[in-house]
């Protein structure tokens, strides 16, 4: 009996040893192990290098649990915002620890993702375009603007802000690229960026974008006009305090009237020019080599800003917000007396 019991124990041990156990991968000893998931409708391809055995989140910011987790808030793909900080969408913007600065950085990255040429366009707009704008402004003033340098400096400051705001607002984002449901109210079916945006939009939809952007730009121009007028008048007062014998060659622009002039200029002239410019650049980017395209951007931005600077001076003369003749006539009468 003892011999039979010993044989049964030996056979049981041999049966257990014959069972194949699953292979256990020790991630701490094999740091180069790669885990990949195939691309499908809800999960993007993921390649993870386990460089640390204490990896807390192997799929940071993933789209599980019903969250979209996409690039800048658009639906369809991407995990963790595609490098835009956070999991994308409005939730990440609202929870940004940097406040307005964080929101601006996220918006900038989203625009770069939608248009890789966006930083170059902004750079050309601020350097070449703004220089051309100042030249156009000075060329439209008497004595090439040398007697109105306070106005020219005000145009320089306000123009640099407005140029950036215009490009930032018109540029498509990764979240709204191809979306027509981002504008409010009756403009909800209109293109979200500019009237020549790619998509199946009607003529009225595109015209609606022109109207909506015009109202937005007019509001921005009104605020910038207030700032610019305050800067210009402040410089005049400062120079008078430093040099009591100084006489202003021109009548200081009225704050409200000059602000309304800026609003009209932005809502009508600047809006129409920038809408058209974005459409032209969109077409040129498809047919021209990168170097030729960048050269064309420089030329277009330069010509656009020269026209913008000249049109603003003409409009300011028409509205009387920056009048030279009235001040000259007053000075002549004072000399006669």
Swiss-Prot record:
Highest taxon above the source species: Eukaryota
Stretches the record annotates as Disordered: 70-96
Claim: Lipid metabolism is one of the keywords in the record: no
Phenotype upon loss of function: Defects in embryo development, seedling germination and early growth. Pale interveinal phenotype due to marked reduction in the density of mesophyll cells in interveinal regions of leaves.
Transit peptide extent on chain: 1-59
UniProtKB keywords: Chloroplast, Developmental protein, Membrane, Plastid, Transit peptide, Transmembrane, Transmembrane helix
GO CC annotations, alphabetized: chloroplast; chloroplast envelope; chloroplast membrane; cytosol; plastid
Location relative to the cell: Plastid, Chloroplast membrane
Result after altering residue 228 to S: In rer3-2; pale interveinal phenotype
Membrane topology: Multi-pass membrane protein
A Pfam family this chain is assigned to: RETICULATA-like
An example Gene Ontology biological process: leaf development
Gly residues bias spans: 70-89
Tissue: Expressed in root meristem, root vasculature, distal region of young leaf primordia, leaf bundle sheath cells, hydathodes and pollen grains.
Transmembrane segments: 151-171, 216-236
Family, similarity comment: Belongs to the RETICULATA family.
Name of the protein: Protein RETICULATA-RELATED 3, chloroplastic
